[in-house]
Amino acid sequence: MTQYRGGYVTSCYAQALFNASVSKLNDICKGIKFIFNLSENGNNQFLSFLANPTANLKDKISVIELITNHIDTTLSRFILVVVTNNRGNMLLQIFNTFLEYVRKHNKEVSISVTSCSKLTTQEKQGICNALLEKYGKVVSITNTVDPSILGGFIIRVGFDIIDVSLNSYLQSLQELSKIAVRSMVNSKV
């Protein structure tokens, strides 16, 4: 399936869906997950068919009507509008952008933690609790093991990076010692 990537149009559609469904976000999210599950079970023909520019619009509408009993009316009508406007190839990106808006609305974040060994459940919970006030609810933690950081961890939340690794600390000490040596050499000259 050809997927449209990003852009103004996608975010406009995603924002429109968000605004239309702000009172029933859970129902819309369940519907989107239902559609994603159609795709993930080896049968991605639903979104592929809606994205196909050569498929007949009446056939696309018929296919959308097949799932209307499984998704919210607002979502099915939204999909009809998108497909009628020949934007079916954008649906996947629209849904992903919409889900980002929902996560921001609910103050939910996903974080990535790089550590020298696998984090325990207790360590993950401690990190979540520490980040709760600044970032909101942590929905998922991805733990990557990198022995080269020697100890501590590096947390990535969106564009923010919190580096409390031993390797980073040692590099800082090395830079400080170079500066100290230079200043000592310069002061003796």
From Swiss-Prot:
It is found in: Cell inner membrane. InterPro entries: ATP_synth_OSCP/delta_N_sf, ATPase_OSCP/d_CS, ATPase_OSCP/dsu. F(1)F(0) ATP synthase produces ATP from ADP in the presence of a proton or sodium gradient. F-type ATPases consist of two structural domains, F(1) containing the extramembraneous catalytic core and F(0) containing the membrane proton channel, linked together by a central stalk and a peripheral stalk. During catalysis, ATP synthesis in the catalytic domain of F(1) is coupled via a rotary mechanism of the central stalk subunits to proton translocation. Keywords: ATP synthesis, Cell inner membrane, Cell membrane, CF(1), Hydrogen ion transport, Ion transport, Membrane, Transport. GO terms for molecular function: proton-transporting ATP synthase activity, rotational mechanism. Pfam families: OSCP (PF00213). Its main location: membrane. Belongs to the ATPase delta chain family. The keyword Transport applies. It is a peripheral membrane protein. The gene is atpH. NCBIfam families: ATP_synt_delta. This is ATP synthase subunit delta. It comes from Ehrlichia ruminantium (strain Gardel). F-type ATPases have 2 components, F(1) - the catalytic core - and F(0) - the membrane proton channel. F(1) has five subunits: alpha(3), beta(3), gamma(1), delta(1), epsilon(1). F(0) has three main subunits: a(1), b(2) and c(10-14). The alpha and beta chains form an alternating ring which encloses part of the gamma chain. F(1) is attached to F(0) by a central stalk formed by the gamma and epsilon chains, while a peripheral stalk is formed by the delta and b chains. It comes from the Bacteria. One of its GO terms (cellular component) is proton-transporting ATP synthase complex.
